[in-house]
Amino acid sequence: MTAQLQPYQREFIEFAIDEGVLKFGEFTLKSGRISPYFFNAGLFKSGRALARLGRFYAQAIAHSGLEADVLFGPAYKGIPLATTTAVALADHHDRDLPFAFNRKEAKAHGEGGNIVGAALAGRVLIIDDVITAGTAIREVMQLIDAAGAEAAGVVIALDRQERGQDENGLKAQSAIQEVTSQYGMPVVSIVTLDQVLAYLETRQSQGDESDQSLRQHADAIRAYRDRYGVRLDG
């Protein structure tokens, strides 16, 4: 089944490629796997790029129907992501939400503590780039629980749909599916790997000479997903 693309999702994929955030080729991951693509949200590194990125996060939130009282960005990459998402929600969706982030180490002086910005109260929506192992999300859940708040969900840029590995081999679920199962909360992504693949296949079918190399990238991503990934419903 072809993954359906909303117009904003197609624009996001093109934006990520143009900014050098989404690359195709051969990349060795920390796990030792050779991936046919690489996604590094840290390369959204200009004011204009970050502002536009926030609008994509805001569109994903609006499209998902998720409701929240506070946005939270896990240190470090999540900090600018939550900030730009809060600005975009206020400017483009008339939703003026407070936001917060954590310090890696609690401050002993001044007000102290490890939360900066708004108090964690009510429904907290976590904003991050990707979920690889789920470790950062589990740490955030401890902060949310300690504050007496509840997690409304997680919003990320890309769902890699990739299964981790343990001593028994490939896990049955992706890291995102594990987080969803463990905490019973939704994880929303601007795009999924299936949608990136659908985008490549669409470009390839248009037959532009400049897009001929996309065929091999699409084939490589499909093979990688079939080996290490999970299929999503719908």
Curated annotation (Swiss-Prot):
Pfam families (UniProt xref): Pribosyltran
Pathway assignment: Pyrimidine metabolism; UMP biosynthesis via de novo pathway; UMP from orotate: step 1/2
Catalysed reactions, as listed in the record: orotidine 5'-phosphate + diphosphate = orotate + 5-phospho-alpha-D-ribose 1-diphosphate
Residues noted as binding 5-phospho-alpha-D-ribose 1-diphosphate in the record, renumbered to the chain: 30, 76-77, 103-104, 107, 109, 128-136
CC annotations in GO: cytoplasm
Annotated coiled-coil segments of the chain: none
Disulfide bonds: none
Entry keyword Glycosyltransferase: yes
Keywords carried by this UniProt record: Glycosyltransferase, Magnesium, Pyrimidine biosynthesis, Transferase
Cofactor: Mg(2+)
EC numbers on record: 2.4.2.10
Top-level division of the source organism's lineage: Bacteria
Positions annotated to bind orotate: F38, F39, T132, R160
Molecular function via GO: magnesium ion binding; orotate phosphoribosyltransferase activity
Gene Ontology terms describing biological process: 'de novo' pyrimidine nucleobase biosynthetic process; 'de novo' UMP biosynthetic process; pyrimidine ribonucleoside biosynthetic process
InterPro entries cross-referenced by the UniProt entry: OPRT (IPR023031), Or_phspho_trans_dom (IPR004467), PRibTrfase_dom (IPR000836), PRTase-like (IPR029057)
PANTHER family hit by this protein: OROTATE PHOSPHORIBOSYLTRANSFERASE 1-RELATED
Assembly: Homodimer.
Free-text function comment from the UniProt entry: Catalyzes the transfer of a ribosyl phosphate group from 5-phosphoribose 1-diphosphate to orotate, leading to the formation of orotidine monophosphate (OMP).
Family affiliation: Belongs to the purine/pyrimidine phosphoribosyltransferase family. PyrE subfamily.
Name of the protein in question: Orotate phosphoribosyltransferase
